[in-house]
Amino acid sequence: MTKIKIVVIVGPTAVGKTALGISLAKAFNGEIISGDSQQVYRQLDIGTAKATQEEQEAAVHHLIDIREVTESYSAYDFVQDAQKAISDIVSRGKLPIIVGGTGLYLQSLLEGYHLGGQVDQEAVKAYRNELEQLDDHDLYERLQVNNITIEQVNRRRAIRALELAQFADELENAETAYEPLIIGLNDDRQVIYDRINQRVNRMLENGLLEEAKWLYEHYPTVQASRGIGYKELFPYFVGEMTLAEASDQLKQNTRRFAKRQLTWFRNRMAVSFTAITAPDYPQVVHDRVRDFLGQKEKS
């Protein structure tokens, strides 16, 4: 089977994945698929660092603004949506470029793991029932015991991750239809942390507070409201924190999130990282994509 070539850009938040994705889309006749669990939600633009209108006009983007904030979204949903988007992009002779930071989503798409026929389905059902009886605290303790880190934790995703860990020896690795080139972006920790702090400042200047307040007033308990960028500001709205304290909390949580992202990509995906401050960036990335596609450099 001839596999479909796709480019996947990963790295910590604020590292510049969107800008690189647009650059590659322009250079290699590509379209972008968002691999971010929060960018699927309509009306949540600033806190999710969604591509701006100008950026969306520079390159076609898929899987953003496809859910209402009241709806849930999972790795399973992402795989189904991403597969459809890839098929659509390829059918028009273009290159799919996945840009994202939600490691579980990307791994699910690229590796195609599922609990197949060799697994005792009654055992799976019994284990799932056991997990569903746990409260949130005990469930997340199970995650820690199994050394599982998942982003934007919710119960369904936690239970799924624990199932995969419990029956890892019996997993079937479904043959995927894709041949990915995984491009990792990173740099020195302080460079990334400075970019995160600057991004949070820009978000607040551009209206994040108003966006978060709208979410807090209308849908404070939905899955989308638990995303980094929103929940940190909720204490400010009820007088438990000053705006400066909430802003600092948001920066700190985002830095921790970036660290978890890097840990995930290093441990779970075959990726080599390129420093965004390197003198030959992004040319080195363009060269890698060109080689991957078997294209010659234009003279």
UniProtKB/Swiss-Prot annotation:
This is tRNA dimethylallyltransferase. Keywords: ATP-binding, Magnesium, Nucleotide-binding, Transferase, tRNA processing. The keyword Nucleus does not apply. InterPro entries: Dimethylallyltransferase (IPR039657), IPT (IPR018022), P-loop_NTPase (IPR027417). It catalyses: adenosine(37) in tRNA + dimethylallyl diphosphate = N(6)-dimethylallyladenosine(37) in tRNA + diphosphate. Monomer. Residues 36-39 are annotated as: Interaction with substrate tRNA. Substrate binds at T13, A14, V15, G16, K17, T18. It is an enzyme of class 2 (transferase). One of its GO terms (biological process) is tRNA modification. ATP binds at G11, P12, T13, A14, V15, G16, K17, T18. GO terms for molecular function: ATP binding; tRNA dimethylallyltransferase activity. The lineage of its organism: Bacteria, Bacillati, Bacillota, Bacilli, Lactobacillales. Its cofactor is Mg(2+).
